Swiss-Prot record:
Organism of derivation: Rotavirus A (strain RVA/Pig/United States/Gottfried/1983/G4P2B[6])
Domain of life: Viruses
GO MF annotation: an example: RNA binding
Cofactor: Mg(2+)
Name of this chain's protein: RNA-directed RNA polymerase
Amino acid sequence: MGKYNLILSEYLSFVYNSQSAVQIPIYYSSNPELEKRCIDFHAKCVDNSKKGLSLKPLFEEYKDVIDNATLLSILSYSYDKYNAVERKLVNYAKGKPLEADLTANELDYENNKITSELFQSAKEYTYSLMDPAILTSLSSNLNAVMFWLERHSNDVADANKIYKRRLDLFTIVASTINKYGVPRHNEKYRYEYEVMKDKPYYLVTWANSAIEMLMSVFSHEDYLIAKELMVLSCSNRSTLAKLVSSPMSILVALIDINGTFITNEEFDLEFSDKYVRAIVPDQTFDELQEMIDNMKKAGLVDIPRMIQEWLVDCSLEKFTLMSKIYSWSFHVGFRKQKMIDAALDQLKTEYTEDVDNEMYNEYTMLIRDEIVKMLEVPVKHDDHLLRNSELAGLLSMSSASNGASRQLKFGRKTIFSTKKNMHVMDDIARGRYTPGVIPPVNVDRPIPLGRRDVPGRRTRIIFILPYEYFIAQHAVVEKMLSYAKHTREYAEFYSQSNQLLSYGDVTRFLSSNSMVLYTDVSQWDSSQHNTQPFRKGIIMGLDMLANMTNDPKVVQTLNLYKQTQINLMDSYVQIPDGDVIKKIQYGAVASGEKQTKAANSIANLALIKTVLSRIANKYSFITKIIRVDGDDNYAVLQFNTDVTKQMVQEVSNDVRYIYSRMNAKVKALVSTVGIEIAKRYIAGGKIFFRAGINLLNNEKRGQSTQWDQAAILYSNYIVNKLRGFETDREFILTKIIQMTSVAITGSLRLFPSERVLTTNSTFKVFDSEDFIIEYGTTDDEVYIQRAFMSLSSQKSGIADEIASSQTFKNYVSKLSDQLLVSKNAIVSKGIAVTEKAKLNSYAPVYLEKRRAQISALLTMLQKPVSFKSNKITINDILRDIKPFFVTTEASLPIQYRKFMPTLPDNVQYVIQCIGSRTYQIEDSGSKSSISKLISKYSVYKPSIEELYRVISLREQEIQLYLVSLGVPPVDASTYVGSRIYSQDKYKILESYVYNLLSINYGCYQLFDFNSPDLEKLIRIPFKGKIPAVTFILHLYAKLEIINYAIKNKSWISLFCNYPKSEMIKLWKKMWNITAFRSPYTSANFFED
């Protein structure tokens, strides 16, 4: 058993170090004899500890248990309610506490003043601006750091340097916190006025960020960056991250490309040894210098110096340091402003009459034409999704807030809730449901607001619109997205691509006669100037489309959509400002509509096209690519002569002038070698990603539990690590120890072992080995997995009560009746289950389920009860396969060059040997014929799980299933009788298995699983035709080989002689594999 259990026991003796503290290990075994010994051992430990006797003799007596059984958990109890943190902290508080500069920020409350100066009383106080929003406390974080420091105080050589650097940084944190005292959190991990009143307001979130940074320090450069950001972020709570990361947009334009990867016709990355010189006009250097001067003005010293030293020769090798600074800057934490300031920010832009109306006109027309192009085909064909748009909207209605809390009746139960799905049900029950009327959002019904906080940017507001807006927009937006899916201009939506494809697209056309124009248009999207032309363009497009059809239902759908745009042109928002709720006329576009992403992309594409058409009046060039990705757009322009400094200068100034004619406050840059957009940046022909995910501060509080957050923390750590920001793994494990412990009573706590947290069950939190997803196949692993399966689904009385009410039942049957032509138990049950699952976001239901799960878990962690089950997990399948594989050593040469310099060595090595992939493996079943057939006639979208169940039914049943969803009987019977059906069986099984094995997550998404180099290492003699079995054997082999390579940086070859007799057995088993959701899978999904 790995490092985790070792750290766990050391951590327990570190935290509970008093005389009265006892730790009792609990073991289990799948072997009945040994299991008896485990139970005896536990009983005696409890007995001895009650009598105050030592446990040492028992460890000797039960050596067989300790050596051969598996650690399940550690039970720890300790009577001293510790203020141990304070006691230990004093030893580190030897330095000078930081003093915040109280004039560093423009907005008064963003200064790190003593809380009682910002908020005179508890009544005024709000924690929302400094809330770390994570279910772990500052004291735990301090404990985790001190634990690490104590553990490593005797390190030697290089390890000692790391220790010294971290100790030095922690001294700053400890001294500052010690001056004011450690803030105590309440049971919800919030910091109340009483605790904070005599302490600096941002102390907690600052300290969390500082700890996260210091635990990510390895080299001397890390130390300098961290120290500077730590010290300054104590005062500057507003602009620090922006100042530090601004230069990157120019730095990417300074490095020559000497060899790069480009996308070829087959959509693969292929190496090109082209050389492209970075052509940089003087003005660009002046702008960069100004940014560096601003950094110095803000008190930064080392970071600007590092940038200036790099500028001497602008080498790609040393660029990793620039990339590091860029990533680190985000770890100062979130900028959380008051809502009023976030909203007024957009309204401050002054109107000028002096704008180029012709350009606005062109922009509007381009939006109109794009909308028409996207929707023309579905509208002309009276697409069933547009005809049944209301039903489609209801089926995919989320359980997010509808803006206001209402009293709802479900049977005898009366509850208060803001959730959309519950409001819809209630409205239908009371006959108040009128999807044909889009409520106004004018001064009488102003829009309530949500918020989005991001490091290094201002807080943005989000509209919480009534559910009618969602229903009206859903179907149309889905059609827009499916058009964008096969349009390369829309980088974000382009079919199954990933960011590597977009990277190859840019580098492909870079040469001595081309330049790339890249613009960050986030300011434009939320500006008032955009509103009228944007909404009008959409309205005009919808009007044109309405004339292309005679179907009243399609016209109605388009009209409702149009109505949402008309209403939003006259929008008011409500902002709580202290006690009063202010109503403000809000003339800008904000997120919150279903169309936000799609419509912004359309608008940004129209914007860059408008700009390019103006530039074309003056220069002669060919536009090689135009791309829009979220808030950014970029284009590669090819001229008929080599690009000169003079040209870059002129084009750059012209582009900026053109944007300014539209009053668009955007950041437009021109370069010959690289770009920087929000999602990725390309420099020196290589691709980089910002590793900016905060670990110890969260953007907002959701309804995830501590276990979920431990999994999210680990997932964030992995993503950062892949992107070049590594936090000490021991620290992360210590956090997981803290966050997954379960309190039994005040003094009793249970700490799960590594086996519990890494086995893929509903409780999985992390992987024993970073980047490697293991599926345990030993007896003990399968035993514990079975045990956990028995307590996975917990009931909730509240949910059952709501679900058995007439209101709920009527709603579900209304959906079923509208959707189905004839009875279909699978679908009806599916809808009921989905609707019931949406109730989970209603806190009381969630808490009830959670409590039940925790108490079941407590029982299980003290004594696992395995149960015989006919459920088969992916582990069972792999366990059947494993014995037939024979391993031999092999070798693969490194044959591909690096294109993603930030990757960890072991992952980089694997890619360099087998190559990378530029596509997502299809794991949703949407490519199968049955899925296409259903979507041709119905608005219902079966999940991969449902398809997997349906495709293995008898042919007659499949036919009934299809017919009930509105597929014509003749099509259904043709389908079942054709070869396509048997291909589908294979396709869906394949997708399902890929889905189970998380092939599109973590670092697996980077590897080319179909690499011929990988295939060379696998030998499986061909026996009989069961493609599904061949598939699983090959996939298993590939994962084994890749996992081995990640772990050992060397290769193995696998030979498998799978008996024909076993094949049929395996094939049958493969049709009832159970999938489970765990905090770990949700965290991965959350990353998506």
